[in-house]
Amino acid sequence: MKKEEMAITVKDLHVYYRDMNRFSLKKGGLKARGTGKIFKAVKGVSFEVPKGQILGICGKNGSGKRTLLRAISGIFSPDSGSINLHGNSISLLSIGVGFQKQLTGYENIFLSGMLLGYSKEQIEAKIDDIIEFSELGDFIYRPVRSYSSGMHSKLAFSITAILETDIMLIDEVLSVGDIHFKEKSYNKMKELISNDDRTVVIVSHNSNTIKELCNKVIWLHEGLIKDQGDPNIIMDKYEAFMRNEG
């Protein structure tokens, strides 16, 4: 039997933060005092994602979902453990990540595309499609700092959806925006993940999204994998857990 090709391999991953909650005012600005308390956001997580699979990640706030996703994307460096990616390009679709807020939406399309490895000519060939899908109109020529979270989400999703990558990391963006755009982006997402060569990791609180789109789900709790497996089974367990927590 042919061995399954892996797109993402995470081994014994640890990611820590230092809580610098004590500051002093010195010349040049705020300076942190003391060592601060170390917060262990991800603690010894290991898993593999086969090429073409859609993995869901669930867990309550503070469970380490976002930290894990940003570590996979390369934004955060592991304190220990390893992350191996087997793809030509990777994109992180997350609110508040990846845009230069002083630049316009139009300029950020080029910046994002170049960071994904696209040439200026390749981006120019697709920029009209990106702008049209985003529905931002003339706002595309305004600085991103003036955008609402919904507008930011529309632009981020449109760039990632039109400038397709081998590995897509999606952080809750399908829950932001007006009802029309949510439906349109959800349908586009289903179209994108229908490609057997594309690997997707989705962080979501929405059980229906994970059940419908994902082949497998990992349930994170306090930085550890609490459970993993079939989305229908795991999400039912997770929902019951959250009801008891409430």
PLM regions: where:
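A short, surface-exposed alpha-helical micro-motif characterized by mixed small hydrophobic
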Residues: 210-212
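Conserved ABC ATPase "signature" region
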Residues: 28-29, 110, 122-139
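H-loop/switch region of ABC-family ATPase nucleotide-binding domains
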Residues: 204-205
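Pre-NBD coupling/linker segments of ABC/ABC-like ATPases
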Residues: 1-41, 232-245
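The feature captures the beta-strand-to-loop junction immediately N-terminal to the Walker
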Residues: 58-60
